[in-house]
UniProtKB/Swiss-Prot annotation:
Protein name: Uncharacterized RNA methyltransferase FN1713
UniProt keyword list: Methyltransferase, S-adenosyl-L-methionine, Transferase
EC number(s) recorded for this UniProt protein: 2.1.1.-
A biological process term (GO) from this entry: rRNA base methylation
Molecular function, one GO term: rRNA (uridine-C5-)-methyltransferase activity
Family in the record: Belongs to the class I-like SAM-binding methyltransferase superfamily. RNA M5U methyltransferase family.
Residues reported in the UniProt entry to bind S-adenosyl-L-methionine: Q295, Y324, E345, D393
């Protein structure tokens, strides 16, 4: 009771818009720094342990507050070159102020924390995070909204909890070719004074630009506009863009005239070049269209897949389910050794892309099943289809409990779990443990340098 009263008292001492000084003690899961002001917890994005900061309080809750950096009084030695970068300098890249070795250190700490607290495993050994070969310019897909600033067309990112665009001249994560194309496109659009979409009035043409690139330094351009039809003027400007940048192999115009935050329209019209660009992973050629799901950091994705497959005891001639398969990337790699792969994916276009890729690569022992994993897995079992093991790669929300129940019911010896959210991964590990399974191996993989995001690959085995 006394602690609660003390917290309330300290809480009342702070007000929104207060400017205070604080020293950061640690980085918590999610990537924000944590410090204490008169014993009251304050979370600060883009801050690092040993930073001494002047911050502005932006929100206050019962047990904590949040603030943004106004000034760095003394920079942590882990800041890049000790420069005093603040939140706005690397908007959208919440670890970019950290030296890369420190990014890896804190990502490991975050994984250890959730495994210890949520999964309840205090003694599991977590090896060093697998570093990315490319720590800048690794993204093969970028989407930026258009806006207007000082009578000039700009692109960038939405500011935190707002639809105001923060201008980015050169995105440090985007491929160099992607940055080059966006810069050239903005110059062309500004010369021709094309109107920009205003979500309040629902008027204006330009909504978003999407660039997809591949390892061969080829690009697909998708211009999203607020219209039900293509104008000749817009087409001419995009053809001009292609004349200036020969690496562009495909151009689409996406028609999106709805009052929505969804980026891509329902109608994507090819106006130049190929329907897709191609990417090669493990000697399998994948087609990438405007709506295709594909790993953002291809070099690191190859390494992640190799780790996941190596975790299996033996996949030769086995019947394997690739659950949440997307376009079936890892399923097709596994199919080279396995007897049969069932690739289950709820997004129909992803399943269709996978079927096309498998056919073009002569992979006949993979079957794409369009539907929810929890339902389709039951159907496979009810149809007496043999299942030796499963590889999971679910969305951030993790697995449905019914899926974990089904794994236990099948008495599978092992499953491999790829996760983009260590918190839900840890939760599911605990649920598996209640069904007689144990987390045997765990490898964290840095798919997204300069951000706090971290992926994990785990081997979950049935207890003997």
């Amino acid at each position: 009771m006394m602690r609660s009263s003390t917290l309330k008292l300290r809480n009342k001492m702070l007000k929104v818009s207060d400017i205070i000084q604080i020293k950061i003690d640690k980085i918590v899961f999610g990537g924000e720094g944590l410090g204490y002001y008169n014993g009251f917890a304050v979370f600060v994005p883009m801050s690092i342990p040993e930073d001494e900061l002047e911050i502005e309080i932006i929100s206050i809750k019962k047990t904590y507050a949040r603030g943004l950096i106004k000034n760095i009084i003394k920079a942590s030695p882990e800041r890049i070159d000790n420069h005093k970068f603040t939140f706005e300098d690397f908007y959208g890249c919440d670890f970019a102020m950290l030296k890369y070795e420190s990014q890896l250190k804190y990502k490991r700490f975050m994984v250890e924390e959730v495994i210890r607290k949520i999964a309840g495993l205090s003694d599991i050994e977590i090896s060093d995070v697998l570093a990315s070969e490319d720590i800048y310019n690794y993204r093969n897909k970028i989407i930026e909204p258009f806006s207007v600033y000082a009578n000039k067309i700009i692109t960038g990112f939405f500011k935190r909890k707002s639809h105001e665009v923060f201008e980015v001249d050169e995105n440090i994560l985007n491929s160099k070719l992607g940055n080059k194309i966006i810069k050239e496109l903005k110059e062309i659009l500004n010369k021709n004074k094309i109107s920009v979409y205003d979500e309040n009035t629902h008027k204006g043409i330009l909504r978003n630009i999407m660039i997809r690139t591949n390892s061969n330094n080829e690009a697909m351009v998708v211009l999203i506009i607020n219209s039900n039809k293509i104008t000749e003027n817009i087409k001419k400007l995009l053809f001009k863009l292609r004349e200036n940048i020969e690496e562009i192999k495909s151009i689409y115009i996406s028609l999106n005239s709805k009052k929505t935050n969804t980026v891509i329209g329902e109608k994507n019209i090819l106006i130049y070049g190929e329907k897709s660009i191609k990417e090669n992973i493990n000697r399998i050629e994948f087609h990438i269209s405007p709506t295709s799901f594909f790993q953002i950091n291809v070099k690191q994705a190859k390494r992640l897949y190799d780790i996941a497959i190596s975790f299996f005891d033996n996949i030769d001639n086995k019947y394997i389910v690739d659950a949440y398969s997307g376009t079936g990337t890892i399923g097709m790699i596994i199919a080279k050794k396995a007897k049969k792969v069932y690739a289950i994916e709820i997004v129909k276009s992803a399943s269709e892309d996978g079927e096309k890729t498998a056919k073009e690569n002569g992979i006949e022992n993979i079957e794409f099943i369009n539907g929810a994993v929890e339902k389709e897995l039951v159907k496979l079992v009810n149809n007496n289809q043999k299942i030796d093991t499963i590889i999971f790669d679910p969305p951030r929300k993790g697995l449905e409990t019914s899926i974990i129940d089904k794994v236990a019911e099948l008495n599978l010896k092992e499953v491999v779990y790829i996760s983009c959210n260590p918190s839900t991964f840890a939760r599911d590990v605990k649920l598996f443990s209640e069904k007689g399974y144990v987390l045997k191996k765990l490898q964290a993989v840095d798919m997204f340098p300069q951000t706090s995001h971290i992926e994990c690959v785990g081997l979950i085995e049935r207890k003997i």
